[in-house]
Amino acid sequence: MASEVLDEAEREVFNISDERPQDSGPVPINPLLEKALDRIDELAGSDGNLTGVGSGYKDLDALTSGWQKSDLVIVAGRPSMGKTAFAMNLVEHAVLNYDKPVLVFSLEMPSESLIFRLLSSIGRIDQTKLRTGKLSEDDWPSFNKAAKALKDRPLFIDDRPSVSPTEMRARARRIAREHDGQLGMVVVDYLQLMQIKGTNENRVTEISAISRSLKQLAREFDCPVIALSQLNRGLEQRPNKRPVMADLRESGAIEQDADLITFIYRDEVYNEDTPDKGVAEVIIGKHRNGPIGTVRLSFLGQFTRFESHAPPRYDDSFTHG
């Protein structure tokens, strides 16, 4: 395909392939052992049990040890569960605490909306005030502090509504080339909006190719790729609407390619009388190299923000206080 030829040409121009050992063919055992020992030394000197990019949530990091290099992480949920808010909280923590660039492909929302969400979360400013410009006198110091925190941070947002895997790799290479060949994290919102241009394949086959391309992206840049994903609406017919692996839309390839799959679930979306108002569950349904389990977080909707240490129950006043 012409796109593949262009993709390979750009790789050669940027000399990316020379830096990626996985592109160089079979490697003998001795250098692999040396690399493994170097990695063990690196991990031994790391802070606590965190060996990847931290999420900002202690209980979640205890299960994952952070988002690992070369991993494809899926964050899935039904509409209104807070997938984008959660992803942007991960972006916020990464750009404020790590030096490597973070690249966000926002196929659903314009970049302005994402910046509003970041400012709302960091400054604890009601997002409605930001969207309408109706900030109070007390809000402005928080706004200025949030804007200052983000200024000059290595965050890049691509909000073009349609992108192919080839285009995504090309744009990632350009950012990496400007930062010593490195990326700290890539976020895709969301997977099902990606397209392979010119394909005549059915949608399941196309999603399979997209899923595989995201895993290849993680491998090429040796960074975590966090991709948001839709879930089948059929789960809403069940009494217990907590997602399971089979609920992933066009799930076969996604389930196979992902190293870690998380589901976002908030019971209050379905049950007005739930005792778990303001509580979100981050359900790890697949973890190729670690445990699965559920982490409870608090959800502050007005700030588009998830926070750690949700107690067993919240009263309704918490989310409005």
What are these regions (language model features)?
Residues 1-46, 50, 76, 81, ...:
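Short, small/acidic-rich helices and loops at N termini and domain boundaries
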Residues 57-66:
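Pre-Walker A adenine-sensing motif
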Residues 62, 93-182, 196, 295, ...:
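Cytosolic-facing regulatory segments adjacent to core modules
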Residues 66-109, 169-178, 184-187, 198, ...:
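P-loop NTPase nucleotide-binding module
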Residues 187, 224-229:
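Structural recognition of the conserved hydrophobic beta-strand(s) that form the central parallel beta-sheet
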Residues 190:
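Walker B catalytic acidic pair
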